[in-house]
């Protein structure tokens, strides 16, 4: 059995770790609430711009933008994979990478090539190890990402799609279900899913300047950018929720370890006291004898 002093040192060490994990849990909870607010604030824009695409498409049905046309044969798929820059968030990234790899393998089994634009240091490190082609990347997005950080890498895939280098673009990110649940999802970005008439709510008659086709070119790019940005913001909310839960679990585990060590410490101290008493009694008997 370890000595009482050694056990006391271990207890102090675990208590210090528990203080750190508890502080990280509180910080993550605060950041999660702010990330949720940003996530909710960006959704109306993404929904509205999709409605605008529907109106523009119906206003000029003869114009078929490349982003709206599904190609007969898919030879190469591009992925935008949104991960985190930091760890300590449970299995969030692992589950995300599994979803991405499963989808990617499904295409590869059909003889389709792939390239990946990872967002987040964890994703960059993972896909560099897989050997997949990485034409662009984004790291250090922070807790308050800016669209400007992502426009360049997004443009790389959009230009590749227009050039015919790739025939489909997917977005892989985590969906925030609730504080306890974050679900990885693979979403098709391009070609853009057709907008159903019921999604447009109203059939307004617009006046277009310069014309509907030119406006559609710009709006479709903005739509893809908004979807990626929404995915990044939502992924940050998922990251903070997962980190909060992971740190709470670590704090709870630390408390259990402290309880076990405290019992061990009490036993060691009791054994030491018993030993001292035995020695005192033995010494007294020797003197009296």
From Swiss-Prot:
GO CC field: plasma membrane; proton-transporting ATP synthase complex
Compartments it resides in: Cell inner membrane
Main location: membrane
InterPro entries from the UniProt entry: ATP_synth_F1_ATPase_gsu, ATP_synth_F1_gsu, ATP_synth_F1_gsu_CS
SUPFAM superfamilies xref list: ATP synthase (F1-ATPase), gamma subunit
Alphabetical UniProt keywords: ATP synthesis, Cell inner membrane, Cell membrane, CF(1), Hydrogen ion transport, Ion transport, Membrane, Transport
Tagged with keyword Cell inner membrane: yes
Membrane topology note: Peripheral membrane protein
GO biological process, one term: proton motive force-driven plasma membrane ATP synthesis
Any matching Pfam family: ATP-synt
Domain of life: Bacteria
GO molecular function, one term: ATP binding
Function: Produces ATP from ADP in the presence of a proton gradient across the membrane. The gamma chain is believed to be important in regulating ATPase activity and the flow of protons through the CF(0) complex.
PANTHER family, A to Z: ATP SYNTHASE GAMMA CHAIN, ATP SYNTHASE SUBUNIT GAMMA, MITOCHONDRIAL
NCBIfam families membership: ATPsyn_F1gamma, PRK05621.1-1
Family: Belongs to the ATPase gamma chain family.
Subunit structure: F-type ATPases have 2 components, CF(1) - the catalytic core - and CF(0) - the membrane proton channel. CF(1) has five subunits: alpha(3), beta(3), gamma(1), delta(1), epsilon(1). CF(0) has three main subunits: a, b and c.
Protein name, UniProt field: ATP synthase gamma chain
